[in-house]
C-alpha cells in the first residue's frame, strides 16, 4: 500500500510525524506512512504547521494547499495536498528518498 492516494481533486498523504527532532525533514518510510521529523513541539498546533510548510516546500505548492485532514492531535496524520497530482507527489518523494520511496509508492 502506498502513502499516497487521491480523493477528488486532492492528493492525500499518510504521514507519521516525530516532533521535537534535532532537525526537520522527510526521514523515510514508517511502515506504510511517510516519516517526517519536525523540530517543533506538538504544542499550539506548531508541529502541524511546520509539517504542512515542510511538505508544501518539498512539493513546490503554496503552504495554503497543504492541510491536515485527519489526526491533528496524533502522530499519524493524513494530509491533503491540492494543486498537485499523485504522480508528482510520488516523483518528489522518490527524489527525496530514492529507492525507499519507490518501495513504498
UniProtKB/Swiss-Prot annotation:
Gene3D superfamilies assigned: YggU-like
SUPFAM superfamilies the record matches: YggU-like
GO cellular component: cytoplasm
Membrane-traversing stretches: none
UniProt cross-references to InterPro entries, sorted A to Z: DUF167 (IPR003746), YggU-like_sf (IPR036591)
Family: Belongs to the UPF0235 family.
PANTHER family: UPF0235 PROTEIN C15ORF40 (PTHR13420:SF7)
NCBIfam families listed in its UniProt record: DUF167 family protein
Name the UniProt record assigns to this protein: UPF0235 protein CT1832
Amino acid at each position: 500500500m502506498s502513502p499516497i492516494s487521491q480523493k477528488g481533486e486532492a492528493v492525500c498523504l499518510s504521514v507519521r510525524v516525530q516532533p521535537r527532532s534535532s532537525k526537520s525533514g522527510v526521514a523515510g518510510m514508517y511502515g506504510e506512512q511517510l516519516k517526517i521529523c519536525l523540530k517543533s513541539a506538538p504544542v499550539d498546533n506548531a508541529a502541524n504547521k511546520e509539517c504542512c510548510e515542510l511538505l508544501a516546500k518539498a512539493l513546490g505548492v503554496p503552504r495554503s494547499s497543504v492541510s491536515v485532514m485527519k489526526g491533528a492531535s496524533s502522530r499519524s496524520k493524513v494530509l491533503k495536498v491540492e494543486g498537485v497530482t499523485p504522480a508528482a507527489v510520488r516523483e518528489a518523494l522518490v527524489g527525496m528518498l530514492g529507492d525507499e520511496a519507490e518501495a513504498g509508492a
